From Swiss-Prot:
Similarity comment: Belongs to the MLP family.
Free-text description of this protein's post-translational modifications in UniProt: The N-terminus is blocked.
Keyword line: Acetylation, Allergen
InterPro entries registered for this protein in UniProt: Bet_v_I/MLP, MLP-like_ligand-binding, START-like_dom_sf
Record protein name field: Kirola
Coiled-coil intervals, chain numbering: none
SMART domains tied to this protein: Bet_v_1
Amino acid sequence: MDLSGKMVKQVEILSDGIVFYEIFRYRLYLISEMSPVNIQGVDLLEGNWGTVGSVIFFKYTIDGKEKTAKDIVEAIDEETKSVTFKIVEGDLMELYKTFIIIVQVDTKGEHNSVTWTFHYEKLKEDVEEPNTLMNFCIEITKDIETYHLK
C-alpha cells in the first residue's frame, strides 16, 4: 500500500497577502507573538531569516500537547509567493518518514488567500492523515490575520 499522501487547504484572508508572505519568508519569529496559544517559540538555528537552507526550530502546542519541529527552508519562490519547509526532526518524525509543508500566498487584488500544502510519507499504514496539523495551520493563519486587522 502507498504510504505517501498530499493534503491541501486554502483559506481566504482579508488582510494584505504580501504581509503574510513576508512573515513566512522573513519574520517567522513573530508568529509566536501573533499566535501565542499555538506557537511558543521560533528560533533560527542556522543560516539567515528568509534564505534557503536556513534551519528553524519550532516549539508549539497542538491538542494541548507540547511539540517541537526542526525545519529546513527548502525553497522560496518570489513569483508564486511560496515558502517550502522540510521537517527533519521532532514529533512528526515519529509518524512520518518525510513531511514537507508549503505555504503559498495568493495576492489577487482584494481577494487574498493562504494555501497550505502537505506532502508526506507515513512510517506505517495505521498513521492517521495529518488533519489535526492542517487545522492547526489554519488556526495560525486566522491568528495572524486577527493580529493584522487590529
